[in-house]
Structure formats: C-alpha cells, structure tokens
Swiss-Prot record:
The keyword Chloroplast is annotated on this UniProt entry: no
Designated name of the protein: Alpha/beta-gliadin A-II
Pfam family, one: Gliadin
SMART domains: AAI
Molecular functions (GO terms): nutrient reservoir activity
Function comment: Gliadin is the major seed storage protein in wheat.
Source species of the chain: Triticum aestivum
Length: 291
C-alpha cells in the first residue's frame, strides 16, 4: 500500500519532469529557426535591394528617349536650303556677260588715239635726238679728242696732243658731260665713238690719197671730201664718196666700235666723275649712230 503512493508520486514527478524537460526543448527549437530565419532573410532583403537598385538600370528609357537625335527631323526639315537655291540659279542672268564683250570695242577704239600718241612721242623723241645731236656735234669735240688721244697712245700712234692742250681738252669735255642729262649720256658716248671712227676713216682716206698722188701714172682720181672735218663744226659731214660714214657701220667695224666704246666708257666717266647708265655697255651696235 505504501508503494502505491510512492509510485504515484514518482509518476507525478516524472510527468512534471517530462513536462519541464519538454518545455525548454521547443523554445530552443523556436530560437534556432528564429536565428536562422533572420540570417536567411537578410541576404534576401539585400538581394531584393540589389534587384531594386538594378531595376533602374534597365529603365534607361531616358537615353532611348533622346532618340530624336537619329530622327533629326528638324535637320531634315532644313532641307529648304536646297530649295532656296532656286533664287541663286535664277539670278544667273548675270551670265549674259554681253555688257563686258560690248565695251571691248570701246577699248579697241581708244587704241587709235594711243597710236597717235605713240607717233607724237616718236616725233618728239626724234626732235629731241636731232637737237641733242646738234648740241653734241658742237660740244663733244673735246671728249672725242680725249678718247682719241688715249686710243693713239694705246696703239703707239704719233698723233698725240701736247700735255697742256690735253689738260684743256679734258676740262672742256667734263664741262660738256656735266651739262648733258643722265639719260642722254649713253647716246653722247656712242656719238663720241662714232666721231672717232669717222675721224679714223677720214685719216685713212687721206693716206690713200697721198699714196695715189705719189703714183703719177695712176689714172684713179678721187674727189676731195666736202668739208669732212671743218673746224668748230663738231662731227664730220661725210662726202658722197664715203657711204660708210653716213651713220651706219659695216659688220667688219664691230670690233673697232667695241674697242673704242670700251675705252670711252673707261676714260670719260672716271675722268669727269659722271654716271653712265649700265645699258650703255650692252646697247646694240650702231643704235646711237648719227644720221
């Protein structure tokens, strides 16, 4: 009988103990899932956040919205520029440049007075040359004698002026060259050369006459040149028997002309301290000869 209550108490204690033991077990089980659930839910929330953040990237609709740039219809609308080019081809009436070819006869017409002006200029130049030649015929005799003196000395001729006379001739020559314009000095040099050649021709002609006079049997007769070398008259007035002295040179006289011209260009400018144009050294043969 005593064992029964003891067993009953043991049963009660066992039941209470089992209940007491069972109660914390479910609490631990509840705590474990609760701890695991937040751990599992956190990455889900983060993934949702990343997914929520990544969602704005696909909606890049504002960038495709500025697709009006490829549409560039406003620029295509600006195609009226080829259309307004019509007025530009329309003002092509400027092409009829008829007024320009029309005034051409006007230019051809005034060419006639230009030719008249050229004739007048040529006449004036001829008149000036004639006046200058007349002046040179009277004034350049001293310069001719200076150059002839240097030529005779270079060739060992006996026809040499005295020193006092030569100094006076030098002074007179320089005075005349100083009065001649610079543009006319080249012509003056050529006239001096021409006068020297004529003088040499005249001297050679006189020598031939003297030789012929020494031959009594010679039937060849020469007329004396008419005032070929008058005193104070400047250049010679050649006779009709000496056509080469009429202001024109023969080709065989070219070396003689060049020699005397070079001598004159070396002597006169340095002696008188005057400027001679450079073209005077290359002027054509006989272009400034007297007529």
């Amino acid at each position: 009988m005593k064992t029964f209550p003891i067993l009953a108490l043991l049963a009660i204690v066992a039941t209470t103990a089992t209940t007491a033991v069972r109660v914390p077990v479910p609490q631990l089980q509840l705590q474990n899932p609760s701890q695991q659930q937040p751990q599992e839910q956190v990455p889900l929330v983060q993934e949702q956040q990343f997914q929520g953040q990544q969602q704005p990237f696909p909606p890049q609709q504002p960038y495709p919205q500025p697709q009006p740039f490829p549409s560039q219809q406003p620029y295509l609308q600006l195609q009226p520029f080829p259309q307004p080019q019509l007025p530009y081809p329309q003002p092509q009436p400027f092409r009829p440049q008829q007024p320009y070819p029309q005034p051409q006869p006007q230019y051809s017409q005034p060419q006639q007075p230009i030719s008249q002006q050229q004739q007048q200029q040529q006449q004036q130049q001829q008149q000036q040359q004639q006046i200058l030649q007349q002046i040179l015929q009277q004034q350049l005799i001293p310069c001719r004698d200076v150059v002839l003196q240097q030529h005779n000395i270079a060739h060992g001729s006996s026809q040499v002026l005295q020193e006092s006379t030569y100094q006076l001739v030098q002074q007179l020559c320089c005075q005349q060259l100083w009065q001649i314009p610079e543009q006319s000095r080249c012509q003056a040099i050529h006239n001096v050369v021409h006068a020297i050649i004529l003088h040499q021709q005249h001297h050679h002609h006189q020598q031939q006459q003297q030789q012929q006079q020494q031959q009594p049997l010679s039937q060849v007769s020469f007329q004396q040149p008419q005032q070929q070398y008058p005193s104070g008259q400047g250049f010679f007035q050649p006779s009709q028997q000496n056509p080469q002295a009429q202001g024109s040179f023969q080709p065989q006289q070219l070396p003689q002309f060049e020699e005397i011209r070079n001598l004159a260009l070396q002597t006169l400018p340095a002696m008188c301290n005057v400027y001679i144009p450079p073209y005077c050294t290359i002027a054509p043969f006989g272009i400034f000869g007297t007529n």
